[in-house]
Amino acid sequence: MSIKLGYLFKLPSYKTSSISPEVIVDLEKFLNLCEGSCSQCNTPFCVDVGPRNAIIQLPNGADVLNLNPNFQAIFECCSKNSLTGVQIFGMYNDGTYELRSFCPVHGVNEDPANGSGAGSVGVFFALNNPSIISSDFAHLLFNQGKILGRNALIRVAIKLSANGLYDIHVGGGSKICISGTAEI
Protein backbone atom coordinates (compact mmCIF):
# COMPACT_ATOMS: atom_id res chain seq x y z
CA MET A 1 0.00 0.00 0.00
CA SER A 2 1.39 3.42 -0.92
CA ILE A 3 0.54 6.83 0.47
CA LYS A 4 0.43 9.89 -1.76
CA LEU A 5 0.57 13.40 -0.38
CA GLY A 6 -0.05 16.71 -2.07
CA TYR A 7 -2.71 18.96 -3.47
CA LEU A 8 -5.20 16.91 -5.39
CA PHE A 9 -7.24 19.57 -7.13
CA LYS A 10 -7.75 23.25 -7.71
CA LEU A 11 -11.23 24.34 -6.73
CA PRO A 12 -13.26 25.55 -9.73
CA SER A 13 -14.57 29.09 -9.84
CA TYR A 14 -16.85 29.94 -6.95
CA LYS A 15 -19.88 32.11 -6.30
CA THR A 16 -21.06 33.37 -2.94
CA SER A 17 -24.51 34.34 -1.75
CA SER A 18 -26.08 35.39 1.51
CA ILE A 19 -28.15 33.23 3.84
CA SER A 20 -31.31 34.78 5.23
CA PRO A 21 -31.40 35.44 8.98
CA GLU A 22 -34.36 33.03 9.24
CA VAL A 23 -32.34 30.18 7.71
CA ILE A 24 -29.42 30.94 10.05
CA VAL A 25 -31.77 30.71 13.06
CA ASP A 26 -33.18 27.44 11.69
CA LEU A 27 -29.68 25.98 11.23
CA GLU A 28 -28.75 26.96 14.79
CA LYS A 29 -31.85 25.15 16.04
CA PHE A 30 -31.15 22.06 13.89
CA LEU A 31 -27.52 21.98 15.12
CA ASN A 32 -28.69 22.38 18.75
CA LEU A 33 -26.86 25.71 19.12
CA CYS A 34 -27.96 28.80 21.01
CA GLU A 35 -29.42 31.56 18.86
CA GLY A 36 -26.62 33.84 17.66
CA SER A 37 -23.94 31.13 17.87
CA CYS A 38 -23.48 30.91 14.11
CA SER A 39 -22.69 34.61 13.78
CA GLN A 40 -20.23 34.95 16.69
CA CYS A 41 -17.14 34.80 14.43
CA ASN A 42 -18.37 35.76 10.95
CA THR A 43 -21.77 35.97 9.29
CA PRO A 44 -22.52 32.63 7.59
CA PHE A 45 -22.91 32.64 3.81
CA CYS A 46 -23.15 30.18 0.93
CA VAL A 47 -20.26 29.16 -1.29
CA ASP A 48 -21.16 27.50 -4.59
CA VAL A 49 -18.43 25.45 -6.30
CA GLY A 50 -20.91 23.10 -7.95
CA PRO A 51 -22.08 21.87 -4.56
CA ARG A 52 -23.74 24.84 -2.79
CA ASN A 53 -22.82 24.84 0.89
CA ALA A 54 -23.77 26.99 3.85
CA ILE A 55 -20.54 27.82 5.70
CA ILE A 56 -20.58 28.44 9.46
CA GLN A 57 -17.62 29.29 11.69
CA LEU A 58 -17.83 28.52 15.41
CA PRO A 59 -15.44 29.97 18.02
CA ASN A 60 -13.35 26.80 18.44
CA GLY A 61 -12.83 23.24 17.29
CA ALA A 62 -14.34 21.72 20.44
CA ASP A 63 -17.63 23.51 19.68
CA VAL A 64 -17.65 21.80 16.28
CA LEU A 65 -17.01 18.35 17.78
CA ASN A 66 -19.77 18.87 20.35
CA LEU A 67 -22.49 19.50 17.76
CA ASN A 68 -25.52 17.22 18.00
CA PRO A 69 -27.23 17.74 14.63
CA ASN A 70 -30.80 16.86 13.72
CA PHE A 71 -30.13 15.35 10.29
CA GLN A 72 -33.78 15.18 9.21
CA ALA A 73 -34.26 18.89 9.97
CA ILE A 74 -30.99 19.75 8.17
CA PHE A 75 -32.19 17.67 5.19
CA GLU A 76 -35.46 19.62 5.06
CA CYS A 77 -33.72 23.00 5.47
CA CYS A 78 -31.16 22.20 2.75
CA SER A 79 -33.86 20.91 0.38
CA LYS A 80 -36.03 23.98 0.91
CA ASN A 81 -33.10 26.40 0.39
CA SER A 82 -31.28 24.65 -2.50
CA LEU A 83 -28.27 23.77 -0.35
CA THR A 84 -26.07 20.74 -0.93
CA GLY A 85 -24.95 20.78 2.69
CA VAL A 86 -23.63 22.63 5.69
CA GLN A 87 -19.90 22.98 6.48
CA ILE A 88 -19.09 23.97 10.07
CA PHE A 89 -15.58 24.71 11.29
CA GLY A 90 -13.71 26.15 14.27
CA MET A 91 -10.06 26.78 15.10
CA TYR A 92 -8.00 25.07 17.80
CA ASN A 93 -5.30 26.86 19.82
CA ASP A 94 -2.60 25.23 17.66
CA GLY A 95 -3.96 26.92 14.51
CA THR A 96 -5.55 23.81 13.01
CA TYR A 97 -9.28 23.54 12.39
CA GLU A 98 -12.03 21.03 13.07
CA LEU A 99 -14.48 20.64 10.19
CA ARG A 100 -17.75 18.76 10.01
CA SER A 101 -19.66 18.33 6.78
CA PHE A 102 -23.39 17.56 6.80
CA CYS A 103 -24.90 16.59 3.42
CA PRO A 104 -28.12 14.63 4.15
CA VAL A 105 -29.72 15.84 0.89
CA HIS A 106 -27.34 13.47 -0.90
CA GLY A 107 -27.77 10.60 1.54
CA VAL A 108 -24.63 11.45 3.53
CA ASN A 109 -25.58 12.67 7.00
CA GLU A 110 -21.93 13.39 7.77
CA ASP A 111 -19.00 13.13 5.36
CA PRO A 112 -15.68 12.16 6.99
CA ALA A 113 -13.54 13.84 4.30
CA ASN A 114 -15.22 16.37 2.04
CA GLY A 115 -12.75 18.09 -0.29
CA SER A 116 -15.19 20.42 -2.04
CA GLY A 117 -16.61 21.35 1.38
CA ALA A 118 -13.13 22.10 2.75
CA GLY A 119 -12.41 24.16 -0.36
CA SER A 120 -15.63 26.11 0.18
CA VAL A 121 -14.52 26.80 3.75
CA GLY A 122 -11.23 28.05 2.25
CA VAL A 123 -13.21 30.57 0.18
CA PHE A 124 -15.12 31.65 3.30
CA PHE A 125 -11.85 32.00 5.24
CA ALA A 126 -10.18 34.05 2.48
CA LEU A 127 -13.11 36.43 2.08
CA ASN A 128 -13.26 37.00 5.84
CA ASN A 129 -9.47 37.34 6.30
CA PRO A 130 -8.17 39.15 3.18
CA SER A 131 -5.19 40.67 5.01
CA ILE A 132 -3.77 37.17 5.64
CA ILE A 133 -3.95 36.06 2.00
CA SER A 134 -1.37 37.25 -0.55
CA SER A 135 0.17 36.02 -3.78
CA ASP A 136 1.96 33.38 -1.68
CA PHE A 137 -0.08 30.44 -0.46
CA ALA A 138 -1.68 30.59 3.00
CA HIS A 139 -2.22 27.07 4.36
CA LEU A 140 -5.07 25.72 6.48
CA LEU A 141 -5.20 22.24 7.99
CA PHE A 142 -8.59 20.68 8.72
CA ASN A 143 -9.28 17.66 10.92
CA GLN A 144 -12.42 15.91 9.78
CA GLY A 145 -14.23 12.62 10.44
CA LYS A 146 -13.28 12.19 14.11
CA ILE A 147 -16.89 11.75 15.25
CA LEU A 148 -17.26 8.95 12.69
CA GLY A 149 -14.02 7.23 13.71
CA ARG A 150 -12.53 8.05 10.29
CA ASN A 151 -9.94 10.74 10.99
CA ALA A 152 -8.90 12.71 7.94
CA LEU A 153 -6.50 15.61 7.44
CA ILE A 154 -7.39 17.95 4.61
CA ARG A 155 -5.02 20.68 3.46
CA VAL A 156 -6.32 23.85 1.87
CA ALA A 157 -3.94 26.32 0.23
CA ILE A 158 -5.19 29.79 -0.68
CA LYS A 159 -3.57 32.56 -2.68
CA LEU A 160 -4.70 35.78 -4.27
CA SER A 161 -4.53 35.47 -8.05
CA ALA A 162 -3.71 38.19 -10.57
CA ASN A 163 -7.43 38.69 -11.34
CA GLY A 164 -8.21 39.53 -7.70
CA LEU A 165 -9.98 36.25 -6.97
CA TYR A 166 -8.68 33.50 -4.73
CA ASP A 167 -7.11 30.29 -6.00
CA ILE A 168 -8.03 27.44 -3.67
CA HIS A 169 -6.16 24.11 -3.75
CA VAL A 170 -7.42 21.12 -1.74
CA GLY A 171 -5.77 17.83 -0.90
CA GLY A 172 -4.20 15.60 1.65
CA GLY A 173 -2.99 12.09 2.09
CA SER A 174 -4.64 9.15 0.47
CA LYS A 175 -4.11 5.43 0.43
CA ILE A 176 -4.41 3.36 -2.71
CA CYS A 177 -6.69 0.53 -1.65
CA ILE A 178 -7.33 -0.92 -5.10
CA SER A 179 -5.83 -0.36 -8.51
CA GLY A 180 -6.53 -1.60 -11.99
CA THR A 181 -8.16 -0.62 -15.25
CA ALA A 182 -11.72 -0.46 -16.45
CA GLU A 183 -13.09 -0.77 -19.95
CA ILE A 184 -16.14 1.17 -20.97
Curated annotation (Swiss-Prot):
SUPFAM superfamilies: Diaminopimelate epimerase-like (SSF54506)
Enzyme kind, highest EC tier: isomerase
A Gene Ontology biological process term: biosynthetic process
Covalent S-S links between cysteines: none
UniProt keyword terms in alphabetical order: Cytoplasm, Isomerase, Nucleus
Further remark: Sequence homology predicts an N-terminally extended version of this protein. However, this extension introduces 2 frameshifts, making it unlikely that this gene is correctly translated or that there are errors in the genomic sequence.
Record-given protein name: Uncharacterized isomerase C186.06
Species of provenance: Schizosaccharomyces pombe (strain 972 / ATCC 24843)
Lineage: Eukaryota, Fungi, Dikarya, Ascomycota, Taphrinomycotina
